[in-house]
Amino acid sequence: MSKIYKLVILPEAQKDIRGIVLYIARELGAPQAALNLQAEFEKEINTLTEKPKRIKTVNEQPWKNAGIRKIRVKNYYIYFLVDDDEMAVKVNAVIYVGRDQTKQMGDRKMEE
């Protein structure tokens, strides 16, 4: 039986998701696409509660040493940390793939 990790979506990641959904709904005029993407984010993030270490750590430093991992959902990367002490998966960023990931992650806390 595999361990089940609790899911923690940090405030920065919550802000990212809200911003993405609002941008697609309002600026692009595609509210249904925004809702579909939000559902896809939720579905994929929820899969991380089981065997989150199946996803390898990122290659870039210092995030690799910190144990940061990422998954891709559509055109976005979802960054997260596996905290074995707390048995938690901490989602700390959701960033559009076309952006400079190193710059975007540079301003983020590794965990909270």
Predicted regions: what is each one?
Residues M1-G67, T102, M110-E112:
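Basic, Lys/Arg-enriched alpha-helical interface segments
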Residues L28, V73-Y77, L81-E112:
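Enriched for short, Lys/Arg-rich terminal
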